[in-house]
UniProtKB/Swiss-Prot annotation:
One of its GO terms (cellular component) is mitochondrial inner membrane. PANTHER family: NADH-UBIQUINONE OXIDOREDUCTASE CHAIN 2. It comes from Balantiopteryx plicata. It is an enzyme of class 7 (translocase). Its EC number is 7.1.1.2. This is NADH-ubiquinone oxidoreductase chain 2. Its main location: mitochondrion. Core subunit of the mitochondrial membrane respiratory chain NADH dehydrogenase (Complex I) which catalyzes electron transfer from NADH through the respiratory chain, using ubiquinone as an electron acceptor. Essential for the catalytic activity and assembly of complex I. It catalyses: a ubiquinone + NADH + 5 H(+)(in) = a ubiquinol + NAD(+) + 4 H(+)(out). One of its GO terms (biological process) is mitochondrial electron transport, NADH to ubiquinone. It is a multi-pass membrane protein. One of its GO terms (molecular function) is NADH dehydrogenase (ubiquinone) activity. Belongs to the complex I subunit 2 family.
Length: 347
């Protein structure tokens, strides 16, 4: 892709997100979502093959449907309230429709079907943008709606997302699909405390973006997209492979890695608000995520080939990608759990 075109597209994607985050007028919010959606489609189709075309089409149809629902909710609200700006008094029907539209944009259950399919059909850099930056705008919309959102609807969506994010990843061998189901589960964890503690939700979103970015950069450095190719990486890039497995376990929420911090804080917040059953269910379903990450770590690091035939191994023919930023990202993504006591300020 031409560097100038790439710069224009990325600027539009960022501008759309910033418009959504800073606007107080519903029409501008809708325009920001549209700019964001239309600008990212060329990035999804960058490889220009049938699979990426199909992924971009699925993404467009899903996001366009969510945008229509969002506009419907905005119009219903303006019909009842007589204004287009954010207000604490919002029509209940409009609030429910708007919540469903934003959950569809985020890829939360039961509107999650597009996330694994789209992620699998696009390149790793495009997948990184879709699973990190593209989550910020819908989350800022939910953050704005937090005081008036339907709590029961949000809790049902969050527990469904955590469960489906765990179940869906159990039989996957494609790393991009595993990351997609992990994204669905993490989004479910974050939305569960959105009403109770929105600031903590933003912290968890930051940690999720940090860990997902690090994992994708490791996969890009190793040029691997399947569990088999990751298992064959030991003789090619042993440090990258080890770091990838540590990041996978951190995403699964295994203590003492960073990924345990958001789960710990969210369960503590839920129990503080007398949601004991929900906290228990989410802790149990989190084991599904941890299981497939542990299985991935086992198959790639603790099982070796029965023979020493070098022809089975993956040889490094091309120069490796630059990894100068990776050490700092890996340290932040795996070793910041001791900072948890300083987060008491969020309560």
């Amino acid at each position: 892709m031409n560097p100038y075109i790439f710069f224009i597209i990325m600027s539009t994607v960022m501008l759309g997100t910033l418009i959504v985050m800073t606007s107080t007028h519903w029409l501008l919010v809708w325009m920001g979502f549209e700019m964001n959606m239309l600008a990212i489609i060329p990035l999804l189709m960058k490889q220009y093959n049938p699979r990426s075309m199909e992924a971009a089409t699925k993404y467009f149809l899903t996001q366009a449907t969510a945008s229509m629902l969002l506009m419907l909710a905005i119009m219903i609200n303006s019909l009842y309230s007589g204004q287009w700006t954010f207000t604490k008094l919002m029509n209940p029907t409009a609030s429910v429709i708007m919540t469903l539209a934003l959950t569809m944009k985020l890829g939360l259950a039961p509107f999650h079907f597009w996330v694994p399919e789209v992620t699998q059909g696009i390149s790793l850099p495009s997948g990184l943008i879709m699973l990190t930056w593209q989550k910020i705008a819908p989350f800022s919309g939910l953050y704005t709606l937090a005081p008036i959102i339907n709590l029961d609807l949000l809790l049902v969506v969050s527990i469904l997302s955590v469960a489906i994010g765990g179940w869906g990843g159990l039989n996957q061998t494609q790393l991009r699909k595993i990351m997609a189901y992990s994204s669905i589960a993490h989004m479910g964890w974050m939305t569960s405390i959105l009403v109770f503690n929105p600031t903590m939700t933003l912290l968890n979103l930051f940690l999720y973006v940090l860990m997902t970015t690090t994992t994708f950069m490791l996969l890009m450095a190793a040029s691997t997209t399947t569990t088999l190719s990751l298992a064959l990486m030991w003789n090619k890039m042993p440090l990258i492979t080890t770091s990838t497995l540590a990041m996978m376990l951190s995403l699964g929420g295994l203590p003492p890695l960073t990924g345990f911090m958001p789960k710990w804080m969210i369960i503590q917040e839920l129990t503080k608000n007398n949601n004991i059953i929900l906290a228990t269910l989410m802790a149990i379903t989190a084991l599904l995520n941890l299981f497939f990450y542990m299985r991935l770590a086992y198959t790639t690091s603790l099982t070796m080939f029965p023979t020493t035939n070098n022809m089975k191994m993956k040889w490094q023919l091309n120069t490796t990608n630059q990894t100068k930023y990776l050490p700092l990202l890996i340290i932040m993504s795996t070793m910041t759990l001791p900072l948890t006591p300083t987060m008491v300020l969020l309560n």
